[in-house]
Amino acid sequence: MKIGILSQFPQLYSTQRLVEACQSRGHEAVVINTLNCYMNINSIKPSIHYEGTELVGFDAIIPRIHASVTFYGCAVVRQFEMMGVYAANDSISIARSRDKLRALQLLSRKGIGMPVTGFANKPNDIPDLINMVGGAPLVIKLLEGTQGIGVVLAETKTAAESVIEAFLGLKANILVQEYIKESNGSDIRCFVVGDKVIASMKRQGPEGDFRSNLHLGGCGEVVKITAVERKMAIAAVKAMGLVVAGVDILRSNRGPLILEVNSAPGIEGIEQTTGISVTEPIVEYIEKMVAARKTNRPIIA
């Protein structure tokens, strides 16, 4: 097969590991900078062009769309879909997961556990919003934030009101979320492919920081997840419609809670922490799906 890897960063560990996984299974891997693609949208033969050349002959793509280019990245993925190319994560599912509010609403609809979350537009709703999520301390998140950036822990009601007022004054969209104190600055990252959790690790934030993102200095360790956590991670990925995803889970006194579903999860941290390859299962899943599409067989993931 000819597999395109949509990534702005060809030298990144994640990109290189995907290339290696494709090649090790006998496939041609082509790294494509998403932002260098341009499209011919017509009713006869839609096409994608890249640095002066039409991209043809692809069986599948693996989107690694950075959050900062979600709109354009989804347009490129959608164009590949229109050309009949299989996308490991389709454009609609990527867009769903990137919209934090929509993602939480989808999880809510499926009855999947998550921290109580509030969303408002007017400053005069702030006191009720704070009470709605259980009062301070609470977490305030920018909807557009990624990798722990734009996330604030407000220790008191006064601090929460000040931060929320400041964000709303800047016309920023924010979520107000209950603080799960018992998680103690840690979460569990599950790497899911299809209907399987391939690997999982516990991420612990640095001393004094409630955010556990490895990009912010957190550290990872191997963790054994429960059957409930495994089932919940897979259900969260299915709620988004994704195939490949990282699911972040908080352990709370009332059971596991989904914090986020990431459509382009980091590969380096979880592979180096667990010693488990997560890239080969991605390619194996693509092989199965492409073969099923060619023979029109029912797809059993």
Swiss-Prot record:
Mg(2+) 1 binds at residues 248, 260. This is Probable alpha-L-glutamate ligase 1. One of its GO terms (biological process) is protein modification process. Mn(2+) 2 binds at residues 260, 262. It comes from the Bacteria. Mn(2+) 1 binds at residues 248, 260. Mg(2+) 2 binds at residues 260, 262. The lineage of its organism: Bacteria, Pseudomonadati, Pseudomonadota, Gammaproteobacteria, Alteromonadales. GO terms for cellular component: cytoplasm. PANTHER family: RIBOSOMAL PROTEIN BS6--L-GLUTAMATE LIGASE, RIBOSOMAL PROTEIN S6 MODIFICATION PROTEIN. Belongs to the RimK family. ATP binds at residues 141, 178-179, 187, 211-213. Its cofactor is Mg(2+); Mn(2+). GO terms for molecular function: ATP binding; metal ion binding; ribosomal S6-glutamic acid ligase activity. It comes from Shewanella baltica (strain OS155 / ATCC BAA-1091).
